[in-house]
Amino acid sequence: MALPISKVDFLIFMCLIGLGSAQLSSNFYATKCPNALSTIKSAVNSAVAKEARMGASLLRLHFHDCFVQGCDASVLLDDTSNFTGEKTAGPNANSIRGFEVIDTIKSQVESLCPGVVSCADILAVAARDSVVALGGASWNVLLGRRDSTTASLSSANSDLPAPFFNLSGLISAFSNKGFTTKELVTLSGAHTIGQAQCTAFRTRIYNESNIDPTYAKSLQANCPSVGGDTNLSPFDVTTPNKFDNAYYINLRNKKGLLHSDQQLFNGVSTDSQVTAYSNNAATFNTDFGNAMIKMGNLSPLTGTSGQIRTNCRKTN
């Protein structure tokens, strides 16, 4: 008996939307480049050992890549006389970093397996390995992404959430990429590591009331009302170089660094999820890994789409 046409259409639709992620596999390089993952891990561990902040920087690179036209390494492309990349976008300029580490990794895997391992996959694996290097839990990275030949400055300016966003803006930015409000709270936990520049939180520490006064004053010492724009302060004041659930504990104590951080715990719908994670690190770790897998599945180029760049900074 034939299915009603509506059900047939639905089944076809479900097959199509699953096609992209179905082509990604955790063992994609098992035979093509068996030492790729260990090479990436070693390079990340070395970079993070030299500078703990680099772990957060590599994690952020993957996020800023995936939120702009999918996980395709477009964020790594340099501007040229006839090509405009995403590095000069407002959320990226003088902010995202770690490109040299990615260059090093790419050079190493190219020497092992020329033209096999994509820059997009390097970003995904480096993000996971950075979290692990700083004490966080691991997750199963799906692989097989290819690299874009295009970038979108306009999308980088419009799609990435800003530090001054209210909760509604954050929910919208993440919803536009298919994430639930819970997953917004989960992925925001990446701010348990890393640092932000004074310009990102100056307004908060001088003008907002939902901030611990002692915490605000300590930040003001390093972030004057005028000047010191690039001075850095850690997102997590308690364990800045450890990937844990302290970010959520800090939010409950009104010690969120950015306006957008504290928006997650401010007498709003997300308060309960922040509280849950502050009380259960294991749940946070599990949810974070699952959310990262989902993020890594944002519009990947697979099969014959895109290319495998030889140099992550430019197209072949």
UniProtKB/Swiss-Prot annotation:
Enzyme class name: oxidoreductase
Keywords: Calcium, Disulfide bond, Glycoprotein, Heme, Hydrogen peroxide, Iron, Metal-binding, Oxidoreductase, Peroxidase, Pyrrolidone carboxylic acid, Secreted, Signal
Entry binding sites for Ca(2+) 2: T192, D236, T239, K242, D244
A molecular-function term among this protein's GO annotations: lactoperoxidase activity
Xref: InterPro entries: Haem_peroxidase, Haem_peroxidase_sf, Peroxidase_pln, Peroxidases_AS, Peroxidases_heam-ligand_BS, Secretory_peroxidase
E.C. number(s) listed in UniProt: 1.11.1.7
Signal peptide: 1-22
CDD domains: secretory_peroxidase
Residues annotated to bind Ca(2+) 1: D65, V68, G70, D72, S74
Cofactor(s) needed for function: Ca(2+); heme b
Matching Gene3D superfamilies: 1.10.520.10, Peroxidase, domain 2 (1.10.420.10)
Described function: Removal of H(2)O(2), oxidation of toxic reductants, biosynthesis and degradation of lignin, suberization, auxin catabolism, response to environmental stresses such as wounding, pathogen attack and oxidative stress. These functions might be dependent on each isozyme/isoform in each plant tissue.
Similarity-based family: Belongs to the peroxidase family. Classical plant (class III) peroxidase subfamily.
Descriptive protein name: Cationic peroxidase 1
